[in-house]
C-alpha cells in the first residue's frame, strides 16, 4: 500500500497529523528554486514557522520522481500538468497541484538534424520520453503541419540518456526539455523545428502534493507556498543577491549562469502569487486541461477501464472537468491565495 495512502472523495483516507515530509524534485530551470531554498535556509525558516520538517530530495530521472510520488515514497513532487494527470491521478492517487510555477515558453522542443521544417520529420524515428509532455508537444507540432503521430516512429528514451542518444549520427529527431534541449540543439546539423512557445500556457510546471496528506496537514501547504514565493522573489531580483541566487541554481542544475539565464528566458514564470492565482482562475486553464486530457485518453493513459476522457475528474477553481464523483487531480489555489493576500 502507498505510504501516504489516499482514496475516496476530497482526499479520501483519514490521515494523522505529521511533522516530517519529503518532496521530490528533478533538474529543470523552473524547479531549481526548491533545492536552492533548502541550501539557503529558506526551507528551514518556513518549516520552523509552521512546525514541520521538509526534506527536498533530488531524483535523477524525472519520470522516476513522479513514479515515486505515485507509490507514496514522496509526499509531493515537481511535475507537469499532463504527468500529474496521467501518472498519479490516472493511477487513482488523489493529487493536489498547490503551486503553479511557470509554463514552458520554449523550454521544450522538437529538434531535427538536416531539416528546414518540421514537416520533414515524416517517416523519422523520434527519441523522447514516451507518454510525457514531450509526446504531447510532438502531437501538437505534428498537427500544426498536417501530420499525425502515426507518421513517425517513437523510441522511449530517459531524459538522462537523451543527449547521448541524439549524438548518435543515426538519430535524426528528438523531443526534450532544457537543459538537454540546449545541448542537443548544438549538435552538428541540428535545429529546433517546433517548441513550446508555439503552444503557450499548455505545458505547466507545478508542485503537487498528496491530497489526503495536505488535508490532514495544511501547514505543509502554507510552508511550501512561503518557501516558493520568497525564493522566486529573490531569484528575480536584478541585483547582486539575485544574480548570486541564480548562479547557485545554475550550479545545482549542472549549467553555467549564462545557460541557466537562457533557460529562464524560455520559462514563463508566474513571478508573484497574484500572477499564479490569476492563471489558475483563468478559463485558459480549463481549455488547456481539456486538450491535455483528450490527448492522454487517446493514448490510453487513463487505463483500460476508462471509457472516455471524462473518466478522471479534474477540479478547477469553481468547476470540474469530467467525472465530479472521481476527482483525482485538483488545482488548489488556497495556498497561492494566502501568499497573494500576505497571510502566510
Task: Show where each model-derived region lies.
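Alpha-helical segments flanking ligand/cofactor-binding loops in enzyme cores
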Residues: 66-67, 119, 163-164, 182, ...
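Periplasmic-binding protein-like
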Residues: 101-111, 187-213, 217, 221, ...
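Short, glycine-/small- and polar/acidic-enriched structural segments
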Residues: 12-157, 172-178, 191-194, 201, ...
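Short, low-complexity disordered leader/linker segments with a strong preference
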Residues: 1-19, 327-344
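Conserved C-terminal helix/tail region of periplasmic/extracytoplasmic solute-binding proteins
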Residues: 293-344
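Secondary-structure end/capping motifs
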Residues: 216-305
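Soluble non-cytosolic domains of exported or imported proteins
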Residues: 59-63, 128, 132-133, 160, ...
Amino acid at each position: 500500500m502507498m505510504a501516504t495512502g489516499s482514496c475516496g472523495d476530497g482526499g479520501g483516507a483519514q490521515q494523522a497529523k505529521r511533522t516530517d515530509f519529503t518532496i521530490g524534485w528533478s533538474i529543470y530551470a523552473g524547479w531549481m528554486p526548491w533545492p536552492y531554498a533548502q541550501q539557503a535556509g529558506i526551507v528551514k525558516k518556513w518549516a520552523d514557522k509552521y512546525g514541520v520538517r521538509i526534506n527536498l530530495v533530488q531524483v535523477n530521472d524525472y519520470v522516476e520522481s513522479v513514479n515515486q510520488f505515485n507509490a507514496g515514497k514522496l509526499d509531493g513532487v515537481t511535475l507537469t500538468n499532463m504527468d500529474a494527470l496521467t501518472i498519479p491521478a490516472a493511477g487513482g492517487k488523489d493529487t493536489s497541484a498547490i503551486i503553479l510555477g511557470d509554463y514552458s515558453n520554449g523550454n521544450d522542443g522538437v529538434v531535427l538534424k538536416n531539416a528546414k521544417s518540421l514537416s520533414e520529420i515524416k517517416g523519422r524515428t523520434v527519441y523522447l520520453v514516451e507518454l510525457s509532455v514531450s509526446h504531447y508537444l510532438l502531437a501538437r507540432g505534428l498537427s500544426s503541419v498536417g501530420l499525425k503521430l502515426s507518421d513517425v516512429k517513437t523510441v522511449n528514451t530517459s531524459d538522462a540518456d537523451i543527449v547521448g542518444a541524439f549524438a548518435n549520427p543515426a538519430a535524426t529527431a528528438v523531443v526534450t526539455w532544457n537543459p538537454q534541449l540546449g545541448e542537443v540543439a548544438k549538435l552538428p546539423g541540428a535545429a529546433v523545428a517546433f517548441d513550446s512557445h508555439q503552444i503557450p500556457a499548455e505545458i505547466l510546471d507545478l508542485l503537487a502534493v498528496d491530497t489526503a496528506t495536505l488535508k490532514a496537514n495544511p501547514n505543509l501547504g502554507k510552508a511550501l507556498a512561503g518557501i516558493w514565493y520568497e525564493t522566486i522573489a529573490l531569484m528575480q531580483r536584478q541585483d547582486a543577491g539575485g544574480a548570486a541566487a541564480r548562479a547557485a541554481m545554475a550550479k545545482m542544475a549542472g549549467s553555467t549562469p549564462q545557460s541557466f539565464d537562457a533557460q529562464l528566458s524560455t520559462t514563463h514564470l508566474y513571478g508573484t502569487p497574484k500572477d499564479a492565482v490569476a492563471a489558475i482562475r483563468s478559463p485558459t486553464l480549463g481549455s488547456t486541461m481539456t486538450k491535455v486530457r483528450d490527448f492522454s485518453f487517446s493514448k490510453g493513459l487513463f487505463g483500460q477501464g476508462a471509457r472516455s476522457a471524462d473518466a478522471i475528474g479534474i477540479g478547477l477553481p469553481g468547476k470540474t472537468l469530467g467525472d465530479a464523483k472521481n476527482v483525482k487531480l485538483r488545482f488548489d489555489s488556497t495556498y497561492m491565495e494566502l501568499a497573494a493576500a500576505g497571510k502566510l
